[in-house]
Design a protein with these regions (language model features):
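ATPase nucleotide-binding head domains, primarily ABC-like/P-loop NTPase cores
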Residues: 50-53, 239, 308, 318-319, ...
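Charged catalytic and DNA/RNA-contacting regions of genome-maintenance
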Residues: 1-339, 347, 351-367, 371-463
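Active-site phosphate-binding and catalytic loops of NTP-dependent enzymes
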Residues: 102, 125-134, 260, 394-400, ...
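Extended, charged coiled-coil "arm/hinge" scaffolds of SMC/Rad50-like chromosome-maintenance ATPases
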Residues: 506, 510-544
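C-terminal tails and terminal domains of large nucleic-acid-associated
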Residues: 842-873
């Protein structure tokens, strides 16, 4: 389809179209990038025209105006100032847009006619490397997807961090899970039909010609890029689908970046079996770094992230979204955290890191030769910290910390080079001068002396000329247009010496030049120009020198990032009273006094800790209790404890013993998915189906209120069937919260001649009059009432409606007769209670107190109970 800009170019109004020279130049540049916004440099602004202008005005909320006409039609125009363009560019990139930047080539003042322009840079959401366009604590990823009969190949690159990885998955569900995990900023797919629904309408999707996603051509591209004869060293020789995706990605990067990418030195194959699998729904339900409502506050990452550096923050996010199953790796991380805590070294590391910049991304800019002067000073200061960090790690008894100590390396020569070459506080831009330190280069120092001494020369000259001419008001000055001058007022101009040559006439003064001043001007201006040229040459030399050290420096940055994460784990463990988890090879999941890390962090009152005990003969807990009683919190906290243990962190529990876990799967509530045309019940069943098809005996499954999206009997039947399937077919660890009390009978049934593997637990509440206090304590056995009407009253339902509901409940329970299980026999417990004439009603505090067993309480539990009792008074 022809773009509007092309139509504008081809308009024919009353005869042959003749565009202005400027518009011809614009259309020539735009024709090479029809799908990108074109930033067209015109003096101090980047201008956009036609469709680009209309789109930019809408997205950036800038003024849409006109710039005369061309080809017989008005020219829509919008623009952004050059000095502030990065902010606008960042907003466009965040919205999934790509931009081609067309610069003026050469000096416009010297151009004869139209100044030459050329596209010098392409910025896309997945290829940005500029600091101003990046989220410092989140990876910016470019991903490509290819597909075959066997499944999908994925390749993704973090150009700002220098990472390049691939993977293959066998289903649409697995593809969606990977995209949810990685959250690419830009996604390349073949321009074909029948792509999964979740990709349609996604920001940043780029459709590319299908022939670019070819395994053979991808292999050739990778071999040429890495200068290899085979790919066996990368482990992708037998991964044609992943190779096709990698080739498509690499081709796109080379096409858009227009330069070599020396910082991409390898490609890694991710092994799915090394990590705990979590689908998109699980990540959403557990609110790892984003809440269901889109808010990023009060999430697990928000509580856990105590990293000091941006690169440490990005690594933590990667770990959080890919918990490992590799026990040896995790044990080493736990041991490293323990060593940092026991020695107190975590505080020393974190204090040292406060002066550490984002070395990972700085090294990328060095490799791409786009590093700015202050990148050099930040790298210099970071390398200067290494001796101190190495001395902190040296005595610690931790295999992982000793490995990191070795990976830091010794970069004394590089540090010395930067210390001697880079000014203490360099300017923002190389063109400002003063980047290279005094004493580093004798020629540069001499040129600078000429410039520096200029001020004193001008003062001396002014005094001499005043004395020789007798004109006390004579001044020596400089402007960028006319250069150096001697200025004499109009009234004194007749006294100007004969050797003065008039340079400029002003309203109230005349300006002159002398041979001496002209000679000085040539010398000084030449010195300044030569000084900047010399400085640029030295700057390029620094880039060359650092380029030879990139591999070692990247390893160093990686070690610093991991050390930052581990020291952050140590700080969190001490600040939040977390404990070191124990990873067992036998199947079990035992958590003593576990807490929800996020809920505990945001609430003012002490959190009620709870236990969990699952093993081979006890694989499912049916959890009952009142709404708002804490069932969902209890389930989530156990999943989060398992997840934290598998990234190397300590956990919010007094003890956690965890056997092998391969998946965490959840079905915890959902709003209507109207955007995809799915009702709550449809979402519920789709997520349940996924769990039933994928859960294994090593999976942890959370099921919350299955069957609530349909009729009572349908819902009960489905909940019963799902619970039985999970317990007897999947045989996974399951926390099954339900409002169907009939399901509590499952624990009493036998299966295949043995125990059911199902146990009942409940959360209770204490009611006094119209008050209801949730105890949040998990106890053995089923609940005996739901407190639904009391919760409705707490939610603000009108009293008349609650009273009517109580009456109706009594009628329904009486009509139900003996049809329900004996344990859940109908009663009028939710009806108002009539106390005897001489019987004083017990208080909520009394009832809670009677439920306590002082002999079973630890001092901390007793204190927590005291807080709860006080709240009841």
């Amino acid at each position: 389809m022809q773009s509007t800009d092309t139509k504008e170019k081809n308009k024919n109004i009353g005869g042959p179209v003749e565009h202005t020279p400027l518009m011809k130049q614009f259309f020539a540049a735009k024709s090479d990038y029809p799908d990108l916004l074109l930033f067209f440099r015109m003096g101090d602004f980047y201008e956009l025209f036609y469709d680009d202008a209309r789109k930019a005005a809408r997205l950036l909320d800038i003024t849409l105006t006109q710039r005369g006409s061309s080809g017989g039609a008005p020219i829509p125009m919008a623009g952004v100032p050059v000095h502030a363009y990065e902010g606008y560019l960042a907003r466009l990139v965040a919205l999934g847009e790509s931009v081609a930047i067309c610069e003026q080539i050469g000096d416009p003042a010297l151009a004869k006619g139209l100044v030459e322009r050329k596209v010098v840079r392409i910025v896309t959401p997945g290829t940005v490397t500029d600091e101003a366009l990046l989220d410092e604590r989140r990876d910016t990823l470019l991903m490509a997807i290819s597909r075959s009969k066997q499944g999908y190949g994925l390749a993704w690159a973090d150009l700002a961090g220098g990472r390049f990885l691939v993977n293959e998955v066998d289903s649409v569900d697995a593809l969606e899970a990977e995209i949810a995990r990685l959250e690419p900023a830009e996604l390349l797919v073949p321009d074909e039909d029948n792509w999964p629904e979740f990709l349609r309408g996604r920001i940043g999707v780029r459709r590319r010609p299908p022939w670019l996603f070819d395994a053979d051509s991808g292999r050739r591209q990778l071999l040429a890029f890495f200068k290899l004869h085979d790919l066996s060293g990368f482990g992708i020789d037998d991964k044609p689908c992943a190779t096709a995706a990698a080739g498509a990605l690499l081709g796109y990067v080379e096409e858009t970046q227009k330069q070599r990418l020396p910082h991409l030195t390898s490609i890694a194959m991710e092994v799915a079996s090394e990590a705990i699998s979590m689908n998109a729904a699980t990540r959403r339900h557990l609110e790892l770094d984003t809440r269901v409502d889109g808010d990023t506050r009060n999430t697990l990452l928000g509580v856990l992230d105590s990293t000091v550096t941006p690169m440490g923050g990005r690594l933590l996010r990667r770990w959080l979204h890919r918990p490992l199953r590799l026990r040896d790796v995790l044990v080493q991380r736990h041991h490293a955290v323990a060593s940092l805590i026991d020695s107190g070294a975590d505080a020393d590391v974190r204090e040292a890191f406060r002066a550490l910049g984002d070395l990972e991304r700085i090294l990328t800019r060095v490799a791409l030769r786009s590093a700015r002067p202050r990148d050099f000073s930040t790298l210099r200061d970071g390398l200067a910290l290494l001796p101190k960090v190495r001395s902190i790690l040296a005595p610690l008894d931790s295999p992982r910390l000793q490995t990191l100590h070795a990976e830091l390396g010794e970069h004394d020569a590089t540090a010395h080079l930067l210390i001697s070459a880079v000014a203490e506080q360099p300017p923002l831009k190389l063109s400002d001068g003063g980047v290279i330190a005094t004493g580093y280069d004798a020629d540069l120092d001499e040129l600078r002396r000429l410039s520096t001494n200029a001020d004193q020369f001008l003062i001396d000259l002014e005094q001499r000329e005043r004395a020789s001419s007798g004109i006390a008001t004579l001044k020596v000055g400089y402007n960028r247009v006319h250069g150096y001058y001697i200025e004499i007022s109009k009234g004194q101009a007749e006294k100007a010496p004969l050797h003065y040559s008039r340079r400029q006439t002003l309203t109230n003064a005349e300006r002159y030049i002398t041979e001496e001043l002209k000679s000085f001007e040539d010398k000084v201006l030449s010195a300044r120009e030569r000084s900047l040229s010399r400085e640029k040459l030295l700057y390029e030399g620094l880039l060359d020198a650092l380029g030879t050290e990139l591999e070692g420096l990247k390893r160093c940055a990686g070690a610093l990032s991991e050390l930052d994460v581990l020291a952050g784990f140590a700080e969190r463990a001490q600040a939040l009273d977390w404990s070191q988890p124990e990873l067992e090879s036998a199947p079990c999941l035992r958590i003593e006094r576990g807490r929800h890390p996020v809920v505990e962090a945001v609430r003012d009152q002490p959190f009620e800790p709870n236990d969990l005990d699952l093993h081979s003969d006890r694989r499912m807990l049916v959890i009952t209790g009142p709404n708002m009683g804490g069932k969902s919190t209890y389930m989530r906290q156990n999943a989060l404890i398992v997840l934290l243990a598998h990234i190397g962190s300590y956990v919010p529990a007094s003890r956690a013993v965890i056997g092998p876990i391969d998946r965490i799967l959840t079905r915890i509530g959902a709003g209507d998915d109207l955007a995809r045309g799915q009702s709550t019940f449809m979402v519920e069943m789709a997520e349940t189906s996924y769990i039933l098809h994928h859960a294994t005996p090593q999976s942890l499954v959370l099921m919350d209120e299955i069957g609530r999206g349909t009729s009572t009997y349908d819902g009960l039947a489905l909940a019963d069937a799902v619970a039985r399937h999970l317990a007897h077919t999947n045989r996974c660890y399951t926390l099954f919260a339900t409002h169907y009390f009939e399901l509590t009978a499952l624990a009493d049934e036998s299966h295949a001649g043995g125990a059911s593997g199902i146990a009942n637990v409940h959360l209770d509440a204490v009611e006094h009059g119209e008050r209801l206090v949730f105890m949040h304590a998990v106890k053995d056995g089923p609940a005996n009432r739901s407190f639904g009407l009391q919760v409705a009253a707490l939610a603000g339902l009108p009293k008349a409606a609650v009273t009517q509901a109580r009456r109706r409940l009594v009628e329904l329970e009486q009509r139900g007769g003996e049809s329900r299980s004996a344990q859940m026999a109908p009663t009028a417990l939710d009806a108002p209670q009539q106390f005897g004439l001489f019987t004083a009603p017990s208080s909520a505090a009394q009832e809670a107190l009677q439920a306590l067993d002082p002999d079973e309480l630890t001092p901390k539990q007793a204190l927590e109970a005291l807080y709860r009792l006080k709240a009841l008074l």
